A protein has these predicted regions:
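Short, conserved active-site entrance elements at the starts or edges of catalytic domains
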Residues: 2-38
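Charged, low-complexity, helix/coiled-coil-prone segments
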Residues: 8-19, 42-53, 89
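Residues at structural and domain junctions
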Residues: 18, 25-26, 58, 89, ...
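Covalent nucleotidyltransferase core used to form phosphodiester bonds in nucleic acids
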Residues: 20-22, 57-70
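A generic structural micro-feature
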Residues: 24, 39-41, 72, 121
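Short beta-strand segments
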Residues: 27-61, 78
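Short, structured beta-strand-loop surface elements
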Residues: 63-132
């Protein structure tokens, strides 16, 4: 790749990430896409999230039993899409109890403890995506 093409791609990626972060401040739900660990096919699913600073926190609804979480363990590439603006990042699985509890608290603050209890059944894993 020529230097000018590489520079343009980097600038486009930064612009897309900035646009994505702006949209993430306005929405309560996003779409993530991961590669199936067996099929290799792209799988997309709507999820709740918490944006804090340059980090996006995800909480699998069935903890470590959640299929998209298992896929991330096999291939950490994850596409984050907020209503038409999206890009691909690296997902970092979190299993440390204290760190997972911190993510759960962030979700309770954003969505309410009642809804987190209603929709989430296992609390042993989370995912962090560095957006910056």
């Amino acid at each position: 790749m020529k230097a000018t093409a590489k520079k343009t791609t980097m600038m486009t990626t930064k612009a897309t990430t900035a646009s994505l972060k702006e949209r993430l401040t306005r929405y309560r739900q996003i779409k993530i896409s991961v590669s199936g660990r067996k099929s290799g096919k792209t799988i997309s699913i709507p999820v709740w999230f918490v944006l804090e600073g340059g980090k996006l926190y995800l909480l699998p609804v069935q903890g470590s039993d959640t299929q998209w979480y298992k896929n991330v363990l096999k291939n950490p590439s994850i596409r984050i899409d907020a209503r038409g603006v999206g890009t691909t990042f690296r997902a970092v699985p979190v299993t440390d109890a204290k760190a997972v509890k911190s993510v759960i608290e962030k979700f309770r603050e954003k969505y309410g403890a009642k809804d987190v209890k209603k929709y989430y059944s296992k609390f042993d894993a989370a995912v962090v995506v560095q957006l910056t």
